[in-house]
């Protein structure tokens, strides 16, 4: 008996039609943004660092590298005092905006069920920004003065017998002004995150017997932390770079690093101004980096 050998033919593989190589679309999409960052962020920072090592004389600046401006900065009580004042006021304003902004965001983002009303309330928070920044700052002067509205009201209701002089032209007035101006930057991100919380989760916790504070501690606060971090970054960057509010509301009694930079630039002392700018940039970068370690925004948002 003979066996017929059968052969199994392998399928013939046909080559895919060749297509002309296209340029990397991702690189093309990133190129404008990267170029913009290099020209308007990286290059100015590098130039500022470079100028901070130039030789500063009384009437001019020479491109001769030296550490004299850095030594002057860290050996001067004026500069170090301004650095400490900047950090102190930033911490106080950050806490005050959080204490004022979180309850407002909680009401707008969670308790107000009507989306139209919630949006309208957020718009009301933004309305002051339709006016000039300087007008919003100077508007506090008639409010905080010795014969201002706050002192008059407190005297009318009998809480005080003499005007409170510390309300204006002091560090307190700067803190009050900054808190009011920048509070909206804390309210917005927190309200956005609170608005994303599924109401059924809170209802389930209530059905299981959880009270408000336990729900807040275990559900609301953790889910709103990305908004808190984003708001804290917004407030921190703007407060650390402040100079106008302190100049207008403190009568130049409060010196921030921003005020030092403005003064040095006005005096044509570019090296000293650059040193203060580098220190301020490092401080801002450290603050933002520390806050980003609290919450991974790429996963949470």
Model-predicted segments: where are they?
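C-terminal transmembrane helix and the adjacent membrane-cytosol boundary/short C-terminal tail
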Residues: 2-11, 108, 191-202, 206, ...
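Interhelical loop and adjacent transmembrane-helix boundary motif
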Residues: 11, 15-25, 57, 70-78, ...
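Transmembrane-helix boundary motif in ABC transporter permease subunits
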Residues: 18, 92-125, 199-201, 292-296
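Transmembrane alpha-helices
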Residues: 32-43, 127, 180, 185-199, ...
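Short membrane-interfacial helix/loop motifs at transmembrane-helix boundaries
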Residues: 42-77, 143-148, 247-252, 301
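Non-cytoplasmic
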Residues: 44-52, 56, 137, 142, ...
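Membrane-interfacial helix termini and adjacent extracytoplasmic/periplasmic loops
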Residues: 67, 137-179, 213, 249-252
